[in-house]
């Protein structure tokens, strides 16, 4: 597989994939939009505090690598960015809506169980049941042009195995286990986080609308 992203590059791409689906009226994103998305406190793990300069450097690098492209003109006063990471006209990586939702959530939050993924990815794709989540993960793990995700060894005392994306290279399972946050009620926490993300998205839309009306 030809993808070797840094953690920050994965965050930038994940944000663009997310916003393309959840807030299409604000997509493509400006540099400021990408900064805000990267530093969101909801649906992000770990929470980052990237500067505009740091994000601009990542954007420039990803454009050179053909994972993003710039969009300007047609009345746009600022340069905006859209992803070419997957499902682009000339790109090789083609993903279904379900696969995009899972890959995006893994890029933004790291290793997660199928249950966590189903809840957290629900704003991008409504999975009918857990079987659909698991079959989509297995498809991503066994693709001939992949694999793009890997199933991690089940941790002691946990009911579900976690999955991790492979777009940043091979996974250090020991490191993931030692850094994994403890969660006594993962399903409830995931639902709360999903609701918090929806509120954040709605606030962002309202701010954008008010700014537009004030112009």
Curated annotation (Swiss-Prot):
It comes from the Bacteria. Pfam families: DUF480. Signal peptide: none annotated. Disulfide bonds: none annotated. PANTHER family: UPF0502 PROTEIN YCEH (PTHR38768:SF1). Belongs to the UPF0502 family. This is UPF0502 protein YceH. It comes from Salmonella paratyphi C (strain RKS4594).
